[in-house]
């Protein structure tokens, strides 16, 4: 009996490290990071560096695939139907979940996904060319009361907010759709549109003096543009709270979830990712884990539904 007990104890002691080692073997093949916008915008710029950093941590290639359309709604639709058990994940903002389903029919819902981590706080700006006769948002409104204007949108949410502002102020405003920041920038710089939404691409052009941030759609001022007001400060009761996050289909294996979260936390402290995110695209880097992000997504969705009257 004594020998049997000792043998059992030995088996148990050996099993624990083997289990830990097994968890560290995931992933066993390359992964795919989905970006819901065209190449060249802030999400794409951040995502490609993030993919390299996660690849370093996970020991497998992380390939970036752009799936633009509908302010990332196309990418989320495809992700919801993905059965790759964690090998395919999305990096990007959350307005396609917290807003888009409120105003249009989509083939996914919040509970179709898990929100593993947030790595950056979204920067939602209204921008214009430095060559325009207006620089502040108040000046844009004053100009628009006397002249027809054009606005370049990127997401259904920024478009909805600007349409409401235009109605309040009596503006004659035409909307020009873009596939992301890379499509927005030449329109603004070439003065083909009067002003536009930017989720971060403006950070490439404001230091050179080519582009100006007129106001922020975020709830708080950007630490990178402390003198630029928010729409709420200007008297409009609209704001966007968003986080650049890692999102996966609901129900992926535990080992995949744990390793992806660990890779995200590793990236949040990585100098290369912090440099591209904060110094190049002007997004404050954070790390918020799954519990906090699951709560944030549902809280923002509920608040947005209340504002939209749903």
Question: What spans do the regions from the language model cover?
Answer:
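N-terminal (or domain-start) structured segment
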Residues: 23-112, 157-158, 169-197, 204-206, ...
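An extracytoplasmic/periplasmic, membrane-proximal ligand-sensing/linker region
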Residues: 28-30, 168, 254-310
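Periplasmic-binding protein-like
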Residues: 119-125, 215-250
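Short coil/turn segments
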Residues: 38-40, 94, 129-134, 153-157, ...
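Pocket-lining segment of extracytoplasmic ligand-binding domains
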Residues: 186-227, 234-235
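Hinge/capping helix and adjacent helix->loop/strand transition within the periplasmic-binding protein
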Residues: 78-87, 101-183, 243-276
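C-terminal segment of classical bacterial N-terminal signal peptides
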Residues: 13-22
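Bacterial N-terminal signal peptides that target proteins for export
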Residues: 1-8
